[in-house]
Amino acid sequence: MVAIRKEQSLSGVSSEIKKRAKRNTLSSLPQETQPLRKVRIIVNDPYATDDSSSDEEELKVPKPRKMKRIVREINFPSMEVSEQPSESSSQDSTKTDGKIAVSASPAVPRKKPVGVRQRKWGKWAAEIRDPIKKTRTWLGTFDTLEEAAKAYDAKKLEFDAIVAGNVSTTKRDVSSSETSQCSRSSPVVPVEQDDTSASALTCVNNPDDVSTVAPTAPTPNVPAGGNKETLFDFDFTNLQIPDFGFLAEEQQDLDFDCFLADDQFDDFGLLDDIQGFEDNGPSALPDFDFADVEDLQLADSSFGFLDQLAPINISCPLKSFAAS
C-alpha cells in the first residue's frame, strides 16, 4: 500500500509539473512565429515534502529525505541588430555595390606636395623657403590640401622669377664690364683690306650682352710711298726751321754760374770770412771781457766754496801697510 501511494504521489507531482510547463509555454508563445530565446530556471526546494500518512509513522520505516524540484521556462524574443536604412533607393543598389567593391580594394596613399603639412586639428599649413633671404616664409593655414598646394606653387613661381631676374642682371653687368675692359686693354691689330672687302669689324656693347658686328665705310688703299698730302693734307717741306747758330758764338752759351754769384748770398755769409781754412792754421779767437762775471757776484756766492774747503784728514793705507 505504501509503495502504491508513493507511486501515485510521484505521478501526480510529475503530471502537475508538466501541466504547468505546458501552460507557461502556451501562454508565452507569440502570436506570430518568430525566433525566440528560451530560458529555463530549475529550483530545488529542500523544505517541500509530500503528504505523510499515519501508516508510515506507525511502521517507522526510514526513508531518504526528498527535495522538490521546480522547473520554469521563459521565452524571450531574439535581439537582432536593426540595420540602418540606406539613403539610396532600390534603383541605386547596383551603384552602391560597385562603390563597395571599389572601397574594398586597398587605397593607395596620396603623396603630399612639398611645403604642405597637416595640423592635428585637420587644417593644412603651407610654407616655402625663401632663396634670397635663406629663411622659411609662412604662407598660411588652409582648409584643404589643394588650396595649400596652390599657394605654395604660386609663391614658388614668384621666387623663381625674382631669382632669374637677379641672375640675368648679374650676368649682364659682368659681361658689360668684361667687354669694356677688353676694349680698353686690347691692342689695335692692323687689318689688310681689299677694295671689295668690308672694313674692320667693331664690337658694339648692347644691354643684352650680344656682340654685334657693324660694317664701316670702305677706305681706299694707300700705296707705299704715296703722296703725304693725301694723308695729312699738309706739306712739311714748307715748314720753316729756326736758326740756332747764335749758340755757337762767344759769350752766348748758357751761363748758369750767374745763379751762384757772391752777391746773391751776402746775407748768409760764406766760408770765406772764417779764418784758418785756407792755410790750415789756427785762427785768433776774439777778445772776450770777463768783467761781467764780477757784476753777477758769482765770486762770493757760487764759487766761494773753493776757498772754504775743509782739510782732508784721511790716513793713507799705504803708509800704514809699509809701517807694518
Swiss-Prot record:
Residues 77-93 have a biased composition (Low complexity). It is found in: Nucleus. Residues 112-170 bind DNA. Coiled coil: none annotated. Residues 1-120 are annotated as: Disordered. CDD domains: AP2. Gene3D superfamilies: AP2/ERF domain. GO terms for biological process: ethylene-activated signaling pathway. Residues 24-34 have a biased composition (Polar residues). Residues 109-120 have a biased composition (Basic residues). Probably acts as a transcriptional activator. Binds to the GCC-box pathogenesis-related promoter element. May be involved in the regulation of gene expression by stress factors and by components of stress signal transduction pathways. Belongs to the AP2/ERF transcription factor family. ERF subfamily. This is Ethylene-responsive transcription factor ERF118. It comes from Arabidopsis thaliana (Mouse-ear cress). The lineage of its organism: Eukaryota, Viridiplantae, Streptophyta, Embryophyta, Tracheophyta.
